[in-house]
């Protein structure tokens, strides 16, 4: 599954906001606008994506 910079940024925005526990996939999906599948993909590959997109 391909994750874009915009999708990763949406995930990081929720993470930095502190509004929810990041393991609550449903809430993270709602706040970020990402599908649950994409949210899980970002969680699984966070380090790789973080290195790729420079956060």
Regions found by a protein language model. Give the residues of each.
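N-terminal acidic leader/helix
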Residues: 1-30, 45-55
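Short, basic interhelical loop/turn and adjoining N-cap
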Residues: 29-41
